Amino acid sequence: MEQQQQQQQQQQQLRNLRDFLLVYNRMTELCFQRCVPSLHHRALDAEEEACLHSCAGKLIHSNHRLMAAYVQLMPALVQRRMADYEAASAVPHATAEQLETSPSRSLPSGNLGKGGAG
């Protein structure tokens, strides 16, 4: 049991690291494309450096705000999903009970199988 919990914890840590690296790589790519128009020099000039600092800061700040909103909304979202799940699992049960207690209906013996007016 202990080993299984450790494996789950390691898997969660790997998922967190992967998610972080995906965000970091995307941010790096986006800011580099916006702020470094040419690769003629080895070092960044002051304008490029300021642009990168501003771009990364803006994306990090946005990410923090999104995560705060996500953390705030998550309990309500989980609660709603649980209610939906419970309602969905109750519907088939109720339908089965209705089928067992309701009298069977027979089809009307009208013009079945005959095409339209005659």
From Swiss-Prot:
Belongs to the small Tim family. GO terms for biological process: protein transport. It comes from the Eukaryota. Transmembrane segments: none annotated. A motif (Twin CX3C motif) lies at residues 31-55. It comes from Bos taurus. Component of the TIM22 complex, which core is composed of TIMM22, associated with TIMM10 (TIMM10A and/or TIMM10B), TIMM9, AGK and TIMM29. The twin CX3C motif contains 4 conserved Cys residues that form 2 disulfide bonds in the mitochondrial intermembrane space. However, during the transit of TIMM10B from cytoplasm into mitochondrion, the Cys residues probably coordinate zinc, thereby preventing folding and allowing its transfer across mitochondrial outer membrane. InterPro entries: Mito_inner_translocase_sub, Tim10-like, Tim10-like_dom_sf. This is Mitochondrial import inner membrane translocase subunit Tim10 B. Disulfide bonds join C31-C55, C35-C51. The keyword Heme does not apply.
